[in-house]
Amino acid sequence: MRMTILIRTCIAMLAIGAGLGANGAHAKNAVDCAKLNAATSGPEDNFRPPASGTVIGAGRAYFYSAPDVQCMTKRTFIIPGDSVTVYKSHGRWYNIMYMNGKTGEDFEGWIEQGRVHLDGQYGAQ
């Protein structure tokens, strides 16, 4: 009986240790999306004036809370044909704002550059 308890305890400890090892390795690769967004969202390198853009490609184009694939906002997306305001680029990302024409609600975030066609800058002639 004691041997069975000892074996089960050892197995449980090994399982916990393996889980911690996997999570620890993943945690080292995790991105702090809030910190990355704060570091990349300042106005100092914005397009002046902002650019207008149109969503291209197929299917939903998801918003990201920061310019990194780990920062996807799963419930916020736009679709091809939607118009956006583009504030800046960072690597392969655009910082954009989308205004819902039906509700007037606006959404700001990052989107992959390949999903937006720049139409030109506001006020440019």
Segments from the language model and where they lie:
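SH3/SH3-like (including bacterial SH3b) beta-barrel domains
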Residues: 65-80, 86-88
